[in-house]
């Protein structure tokens, strides 16, 4: 007979060992303080956990991992890769150590439709909702991480998540002073050092804090280039009395300086470049890994032909934009997060989580060849230009940097007022603010040709930082590739009731959230009518046309002058759930939730001049919406943790880039619905002491409900009835870990990812693959060195060759509607070996 009792906690109160369940995995302090759940405790073993599997109690499908498992994985690895062992999540890593980023798919939803949160604050970009997995917290500082595969919390401050939530939380400082230092070495010249120092309790009020820093540098696993990452972190925690109240303040600063990877092109479905009857109909177009002399190591160009610099001669840089040294992805990110809980009176609790985030990043191809006498450089002048290469003439075409810089200042607040009506009924009201100032610029910058065969950008952010690095035209105007400012403001109100019935066997949660989302768009350049192209110039336009558009010089292309627009979106979204406990350690649960994703910034900057009213507008893109249904069963004993669920999702108003016949261009628009059903299973078992087994299975059947129009001729992509791209229908994972003695422990794990469609019409796919990883640790505690160990990790043990990320297309068949060029894909990292030595004090 199991010995059962209730344990109540808030997520901010950390426990020893592997206590991670229910509210401990909630996103915000408010959700943590609200999700008071039952934990099964079984004698001396503590809360139910079996290896990777951790008992959950919430009325939604959630899978959680903790630091004990995270620490067995490769040092410095992105937390998304570590979570990839859980069901429902497909994460494809772009390199063996995680600093190049990767791609998220969760029950078929891409990363921009999945909310990624850090101590409850949203991390998805405010403009296009992208998740940058290479900028996440050092894994050694993460206490726990969880995946809600279907629904968000009722107070989740998101205007983008239609496909679930990924959340992680930081370590709490310890009461005792101490810390550790560690160093890692690995393949591809991998070098990483990290340290953490806990102050212990300081001052008269039991204040605790920790400081941490890390530095990582390694070579790309293919091609030429390196990846460098520096991160600093700190946290301070102040308990307020002995009732769970506290104030905490924490923050990271992360700096990435990476060379990009280039994925190989894939074969066409016919194996030839052209459609039947065309000149290229018999030209082979096979997978580039088969035709390139570099094979699976195909990447950006390794050489650069030195451009000539000759006075009186028209020198032209004929190199492509694919030289490795000019393909970079720099970013500076940081945030400050506050978490707090205050008991106002018996049964009344207030939680307040404020935050500020900063982002400075650059991406894209970032370069162009600019003629020295171009109109951009002449500006309002009829003749002349700028001598860019210093050879004394204005005849040349010189490569310059054209960055796509994004600078975001983001302010957030997530607060809850929680009222315990009595022992079995609880009411919460919550308010969330997410305000982002999104500045997107592209000030041209210079390229350093001091070594003409190995050029480098003078500054990774172009002309943003230094005046001397800018390209200035004859009018004194700094050339720009883009210039716009966007404000994204979310005000959200939510209410939740939680009640226990039938002698606490039944827990019911009834919630609703009301997001009010506003986008302010300020375009400072001229927008090409019915296009996303812009012209940033000091050149004076011709007199305005009757419709308000303008032209330049003798050209007939119409542009819309700089403008400002405002768009608003709102909705009422229910979030319901129930859990029923019965028997010994058994329960069933069900949930229903609705979500929305407002149109992204880039969708809204494609504008036209309405031919009837002459006002500036664009096709009315409505928010995407989803309805998620979950039903699950859980079984927990002292040695077994099992969770099984079935689900259905209705995804409506799906936004894709399609042809609009009125605009005669491609724009983002709502094209229909996706219906998905599936099942997920996870199980952990500890058959004997020190042996842990874990396994998962995920099944997904998703179907597009509509076709969509491709071009002015009315060609249609036959997508109705097809499956979603990049989404495996089957995934399996397993892990075995065993502690042989007090000195040595090891684990081996594998993840199988099924076939994935490359094209919307499902005429091309990539093969399934299996990646096996190994970890082994030698612990030196028996030598009196508690917390000191040597760990080895081998990723992709069997050296599987596979495609990771995919550049999808409408079709892979030349001559078919929607075909443009061969698709491409990222290459999975080969076998990689690394070692980490940690010394604790």
Range-by-range predicted roles:
Residues 237-239, 244-337, 362-406, 452-486, ...:
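Acidic/polar loop-and-plug regions of large Gram-negative outer-membrane beta-barrel proteins
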Residues 164-201, 211-223, 749:
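Short strand-turn segments of transmembrane beta-barrel domains in outer membranes
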Residues 37-74, 103, 145-147:
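N-terminal periplasmic "start-of-domain" segments of outer-membrane beta-barrel proteins
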Residues 351-353, 501, 581, 587-589, ...:
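Membrane-embedded beta-barrel scaffold of Gram-negative outer-membrane proteins
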Residues 503, 641, 645-651, 667-760, ...:
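Gram-negative outer-membrane beta-barrel transporters
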């Amino acid at each position: 007979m199991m010995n059962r009792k209730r344990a109540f906690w808030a997520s901010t109160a950390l426990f020893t060992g592997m206590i991670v369940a229910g509210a401990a995995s909630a996103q915000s302090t408010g959700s943590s303080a609200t999700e008071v759940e039952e934990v099964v405790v079984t004698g001396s073993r503590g809360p139910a956990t079996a290896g990777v599997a951790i008992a959950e109690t919430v009325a939604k499908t959630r899978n959680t991992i903790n630091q004990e498992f995270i620490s067995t994985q490769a040092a410095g690895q992105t937390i998304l890769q570590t979570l990839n062992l859980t069901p429902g999540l497909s994460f494809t890593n772009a390199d063996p150590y995680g600093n190049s980023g990767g791609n998220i798919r969760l029950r078929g939803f891409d990363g921009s439709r999945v909310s990624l949160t850090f101590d409850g604050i949203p991390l998805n970009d405010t403009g296009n909702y992208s998740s940058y997995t290479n900028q996440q917290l050092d894994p050694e500082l993460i206490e726990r991480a969880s995946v809600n595969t279907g629904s968000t919390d009722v107070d989740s401050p998101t205007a983008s998540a239609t496909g679930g939530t990924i959340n992680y939380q930081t370590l709490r400082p310890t009461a005792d002073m101490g810390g550790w230092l560690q160093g890692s070495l690995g393949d591809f010249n991998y070098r990483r050092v990290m340290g953490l120092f806990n102050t212990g309790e300081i001052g008269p009020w039991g204040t605790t804090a920790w400081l941490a820093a890390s530095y990582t540098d390694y070579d790309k696993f293919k091609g030429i280039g390196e990846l460098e990452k520096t991160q600093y972190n700190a946290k301070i925690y102040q308990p307020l009395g002995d009732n769970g109240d506290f104030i905490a303040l924490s923050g990271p600063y992360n700096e990435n300086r990476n060379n990009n990877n280039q994925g190989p092109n894939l074969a066409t479905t016919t194996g030839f470049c052209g459609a039947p009857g065309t000149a290229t109909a018999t030209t082979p177009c096979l997978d580039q890994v088969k035709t390139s002399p570099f094979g699976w190591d195909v990447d950006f160009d390794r050489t650069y032909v030195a451009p000539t610099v000759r006075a009186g001669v028209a020198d032209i840089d004929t190199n492509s934009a694919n030289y490795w040294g000019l393909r970079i992805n720099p970013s500076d990110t940081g945030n400050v997060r506050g978490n707090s809980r205050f008991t106002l009176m018996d049964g009344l609790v207030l939680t307040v989580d404020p935050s500020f985030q900063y982002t400075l990043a650059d991406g894209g191809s970032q370069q162009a060849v600019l003629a020295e006498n171009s109109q951009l450089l002449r500006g309002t002048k009829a003749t002349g230009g700028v001598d860019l290469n210093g050879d004394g003439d204005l005849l040349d075409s010189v490569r310059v940097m054209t960055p796509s810089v994004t600078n975001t200042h983001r302010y957030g607040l997530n607060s809850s007022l929680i009222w315990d009506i009595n022992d079995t009924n609880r009411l919460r009201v919550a308010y969330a603010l997410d305000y982002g100032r999104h500045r997107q610029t592209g000030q041209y910058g210079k390229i350093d040709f001091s070594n003409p065969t190995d050029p480098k950008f003078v500054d990774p952010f172009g002309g943003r930082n230094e005046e001397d690095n800018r390209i200035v035209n004859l009018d004194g105007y700094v050339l720009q590739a883009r210039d716009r400012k966007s404000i994204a403001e979310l005000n959200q109100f939510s209410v939740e009731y939680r009640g226990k019935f039938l002698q606490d066997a039944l827990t019911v949660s009834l919630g609703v959230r009301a997001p009010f989302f506003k986008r302010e768009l300020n375009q400072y350049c001229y927008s090409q009518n019915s296009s996303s192209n812009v012209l940033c110039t000091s050149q004076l336009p011709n007199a305005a046309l009757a419709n308000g558009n303008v032209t330049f010089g003798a050209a007939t292309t119409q542009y819309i002058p700089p403008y400002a627009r405002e768009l608003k979106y709102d909705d009422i979204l229910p979030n319901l759930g129930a859990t029923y406990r019965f028997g010994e350690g058994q329960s069933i649960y069900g949930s229903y939730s609705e979500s929305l994703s407002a149109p992204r910034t880039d969708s809204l900057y494609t504008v036209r001049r309405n031919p009837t009213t002459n006002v500036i507008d664009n096709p009315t893109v409505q928010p995407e919406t989803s309805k998620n249904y979950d039903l699950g069963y859980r079984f927990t004993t002292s040695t077994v943790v099992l969770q099984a669920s079935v689900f259905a999702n209705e995804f409506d108003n799906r936004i894709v880039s399609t042809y609009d016949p009125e605009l005669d261009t491609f724009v983002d628009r709502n094209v229909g619905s996706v219906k998905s059903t599936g099942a997920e299973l996870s199980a952990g078992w500890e058959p004997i002491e020190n042996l842990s087994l874990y396994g998962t299975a995920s099944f997904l059947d998703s179907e597009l409900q509509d076709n969509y129009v491709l071009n002015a001729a009315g060609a249609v992509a036959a997508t109705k009835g097809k499956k979603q791209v990049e989404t495996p229908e089957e995934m399996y994972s397993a892990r075995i870990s065993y502690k042989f003695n007090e000195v040595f422990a090891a684990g081996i794990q594998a993840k199988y990812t099924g076939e994935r469609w490359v094209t919307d019409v499902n005429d091309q796919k990539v093969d399934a693959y299996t990646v096996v990883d190994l970890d082994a640790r030698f612990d030196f505690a028996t030598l009196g060195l508690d917390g000191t160990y040597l760990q080895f990790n081998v990723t992709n043990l069997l050296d599987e060759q596979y495609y990771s990320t995919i550049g999808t297309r409408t079709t892979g068949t030349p001559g078919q509607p929607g075909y443009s060029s061969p698709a491409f894909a990222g290459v999975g990292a080969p076998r990689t070996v690394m070692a980490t030595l940690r010394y604790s004090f």
